[in-house]
Amino acid sequence: MTEEYWKGVDKIQYVGHQDKKSGLGFQYYNPEEEIMGKKMKDWLRFAVAYWHTFDQRLVDPFGDGTAQRPYDKYTDPMDLALAKVDAAFEFYQKLGVDYLCFHDRDLAPEGDTLRETNANLDKVVDKIVEYQKTSGMKVLWNTSNMFTNPRFVEGAATSPYADVFAYSAAQLKHSLEIGKRVGSENYVFWGGREGYESLWNTNMKQEQEHAAKIFHMAKDYANEIGFDAQMLLEPKPKEPTTHQYDFDAATTIAFMKEYDLDKDFKLNLEGNHANLAGHTYQHEIRVAREAGLLGSLDANQGDKLIGWDIDEYPSNLYETTAAMYEVVENGSIGPRGGLNFDAKPRRSAFAPEDLFLGHIVGMDSFAAGLRVAAAMKQDGFLDNLKADRYSSYKSGVGADIESGKADLKSLEAYAIDKPQSELIAATHSDHLEEIKDTINHYIIDTLSK
């Protein structure tokens, strides 16, 4: 039996609206409760991010790490890596989640060669697979870290150096093999350094062609080895590069269509990345779902006062409600999607239990958002609003426009003699402030029950 790492923490339970002083517990996330015919746990499919939860030391550009973790006593890199697996699976069991996500380099230290690195990684993956057999834990997605090591200083697939491209492809090959071993439901590509610092010395077309080339290689090899995962691209506009090629959902979808990737790839969308691109999280989810390309979600939030990616645990109920309304409209997050907490505690929240507290607020916030979104959907509130707003397209000239019967000549004949007073009279106030007030009341009323 392994040692207990998270001492003093019992399995987190649904406690409802009890006083928070009663201890750790979920107020809104009740995994077995049915919402619109589906269990909450199946709507949300929560996952824990290995990197932020078990590897993140809470460093910032101005100070060393503050994190206190129960496995800090291990100094040998491989001993530490194996101890983290024990701690991680205890954490999953106590938190009550079914999924994890990881980069290859989250799990094990690198060696001098890729062969040595793969051997280290395989030892840790062996242990994860054994835990999966006894715990039932599943992998929502895995991926390759091709941005941290100095060899990726100018990108991986988009590097100007062929040796780096070759190394990246070899690393990716092994990561796909690991994905098959652990039964990963998705495989994510986040191009951490797939972009440029300056256009003056950049062949942008060649770099994007190389990125598409490695994505096709990945899908081809996954098919070859029987790794049936949904491939996902994750947009982010900047940081660490000045400009990244997968800027936002719309840009990434255009890239996918340009290079014939949209049949095999979907999108993994993150809240903080949406903010950096100048969008709301809801906007990015809407763009993806209406294109039929919503794959999975990373759950976190940014700060409008801070211009970088802070990966804060989500707590804004208005934002989680908006995100979950898009999910409810879609019928699910995606064919195999989930909500991965790509989030970390603040540097001042350094105690081990803060990892539980952060996940609890995130899980409760999205569960609350689901409850409110379902209430609005079941009442038909927003559906009725939109149906009324666009009702002019149900008959007359509007119906002709919708059906394709109208053309420029027929529309000119219809509009050319209409006085401005008649056109203005056809418009109506949308009472947007009332809509926002009503949404506020849905949040307050639904969550007070």
Swiss-Prot record:
Protein location: Cytoplasm
Gene3D superfamilies for the chain: Divalent-metal-dependent TIM barrel enzymes
GO molecular function annotations of the record: magnesium ion binding; xylose isomerase activity
UniProt-listed GO biological process terms: D-xylose metabolic process
Alphabetized InterPro entries for the sequence: Xyl_isomerase-like_sf, Xylose_isom_bac, Xylose_isomerase
Keyword hit for Metal-binding: yes
List of residues binding Mg(2+) 1: E234, E270, D298, D342
Note on how the cofactor is bound: Binds 2 magnesium ions per subunit.
Induction description: By D-xylose.
Cofactor(s) demanded: Mg(2+)
Uppermost EC category: isomerase
Superkingdom: Bacteria
Active site (record annotation): H103, D106
SUPFAM superfamilies in the cross-refs: Xylose isomerase-like
EC number: 5.3.1.5
Signal peptide: none
Subunit structure: Homotetramer.
Alphabetized PANTHER family for the sequence: PTHR48408, XYLOSE ISOMERASE (PTHR48408:SF1)
Family affiliation: Belongs to the xylose isomerase family.
Name assigned to this protein: Xylose isomerase
Species annotation: Levilactobacillus brevis
Gene it is expressed from: xylA
